[in-house]
Swiss-Prot record:
Listed GO CC annotations: cytoplasm
Protein name in the entry: Regulatory protein RecX
Physiological role: Modulates RecA activity.
InterPro entries given in the database record: RecX_HTH_1st (IPR053926), RecX_HTH_2nd (IPR053924), RecX_HTH_3rd (IPR053925), Regulatory_RecX (IPR003783), WH-like_DNA-bd_sf (IPR036388)
Organism: Yersinia enterocolitica serotype O:8 / biotype 1B (strain NCTC 13174 / 8081)
Family of this protein: Belongs to the RecX family.
Region (Disordered): 19-49
Classification via Pfam families: RecX_HTH1, RecX_HTH2, RecX_HTH3
Keywords in alphabetical order: Cytoplasm
Chief subcellular location: cytoplasm
Localization of this protein: Cytoplasm
Length: 167
C-alpha cells in the first residue's frame, strides 16, 4: 500500500485529479525508475504485470479523501476556471469533466458557483482569433460561429455576440 500511496501523493502533488482519474492511474502499470509508463525494470515484455488489488486502491482513495488531498468538487471548480481561462466554453468543459468521471451534480454545482460571463468570454475568444472587429458578412460569420461551437460555446452565447454588436 505504501508504494501506491506514495504514487497517489506524487500524482496529487502535481495537480488535482478526479477520483475516477486517480483510480485509473493507480490501477495502471507503475512508473519505472526512468519514469516511462508501462515499463518495469527487470521485466521482459512477455511477462504479465501483477494486478493491483482493488481493495488497496480503495484504501488509498479513502486515505486521500480523509486528508483532503482528493476532492471532486474542488477539482471541478479548478478545472472550469482553468479551461475557461484558455478560452473554452461551458459545453466543452462539461463534456471533459464527464469524461474524467466527475458526477453530474458536482459539475452543475461547480458551474453555478463559477462567476464566468460566458457571453463575454465567447466574444473575447472570437476577437482574439478573428480580430477586434467581428465580421458581418454571412460567410465570415459562419466561420466564427463554427469556431466558437468547436470551443464549446452554446448557440445563444454566440448569437449574443452579434446581438450586442448590432446594438
Amino acid at each position: 500500500m505504501n508504494d501506491l500511496l506514495s504514487r497517489a501523493m506524487r500524482l496529487l502533488s502535481q495537480r488535482d485529479h478526479s477520483e475516477s482519474e486517480l483510480r485509473r492511474k493507480l490501477a495502471s502499470q507503475p512508473f519505472s525508475a526512468k519514469g516511462h509508463w508501462g515499463k518495469q525494470t527487470g521485466r521482459s515484455d512477455n511477462e504479465p504485470v501483477a494486478d493491483i488489488d482493488p481493495k488497496v486502491i480503495e484504501q488509498v482513495i479513502a486515505y486521500c479523501y480523509q486528508h483532503n488531498w482528493l476532492d471532486d468538487a474542488r477539482f471541478a471548480t479548478s478545472y472550469i476556471n482553468s479551461r475557461s481561462r484558455k478560452g473554452y466554453g461551458a459545453q466543452r468543459i462539461r463534456s471533459e469533466l464527464m469524461q474524467k468521471g466527475v458526477d453530474k451534480e458536482l459539475i452543475q454545482a461547480a458551474f453555478e458557483i463559477s462567476e464566468i460571463n460566458w457571453c463575454l468570454l465567447a466574444k473575447e475568444v472570437a476577437q482574439r482569433k478573428f480580430s477586434e472587429i467581428l465580421p458581418i458578412e454571412w460567410k465570415e460569420k459562419v466561420k466564427v460561429q463554427r469556431y466558437l461551437l468547436y470551443r464549446g460555446f452554446f448557440q445563444e452565447e454566440i448569437q449574443s455576440i452579434y446581438n450586442d454588436f448590432v446594438e
